[in-house]
Amino acid sequence: MSSLLEKTRQLNKILQKSGAEPVVFDDICNLLSEVLSCNVYIISKKGKILGYDLSTGFECQTVRDKVVPEKRFPEHYNNKLLNVHGTKSNLENQGECVFESGEDCGVKNKLTTIVPINGNRERLGTLLLARFDVPFTDDDLIISEYSATIIGLEILRSKQDEIEEEARKKAVVQLAIGTLSYSELEAVEHIFNELDGPEGLLVASKIADKVGITRSVIVNALRKFESAGVIESRSLGMKGTHIKILNDRLLEELKKIK
């Protein structure tokens, strides 16, 4: 498929899909790489690689050995990308490595195109395209900028999903805490002080003696939390009970009560 219309229709399929379910950024990269015959990176505002595709088979060793495994571009390079406020196409590396200052680039004839990803009047990230020998055309840039718009919408939606998920987890924890009696709440505070992390071993009898409450109070408190889905517990017999926190908002909400 070579025409601009046909390429746009391919991207529209992703946009239509995004109305019903989240788009995986790697899917966008795979399609863009196929449509534009180039390497593609979607980079967050903080430099994290949200998705990429190197299906052209060509890329410098630094990218393959450092950038891709770490899923992050160097801070100084990401800052340069963020300082680009409009599309810049067919940038040449001038024989120098853009990641390692003072180092020569072993890849020749590499052309880079930078497309800012914006949404809600803020910079959300960068769409980075790399090709060898063949310059990006105006049609390629139209496709790239259109793709950046799609990606921007997806980043905004994923941010909103994160906000909603955090609110849900917080509400679940608050409801679980609300079901505890005063003595159960006191027991819970001591339990997670003893735990000292997201999971660990608890000996209920030791805490009961230390706090001056019955063992049944501790057991009831743990059952309520487990029913709410905020923890997972497993009896290890005489050794005690292994507890794992499933809701990462739990410790934070307990701290607010103190």
From Swiss-Prot:
GO terms for molecular function: DNA binding; DNA-binding transcription factor activity; GTP binding. InterPro entries: CodY, GAF-like_dom_sf, GTP_trans_reg_CodY_C, Transc_reg_CodY_N, WH-like_DNA-bd_sf, WH_DNA-bd_sf. Disulfide bonds: none annotated. One of its GO terms (cellular component) is cytoplasm. It is found in: Cytoplasm. Keywords: Cytoplasm, DNA-binding, Repressor, Transcription, Transcription regulation. The keyword Transcription regulation applies. One of its GO terms (biological process) is negative regulation of DNA-templated transcription. Residues 1-156 are annotated as: GAF domain. Belongs to the CodY family. This is Global transcriptional regulator CodY.
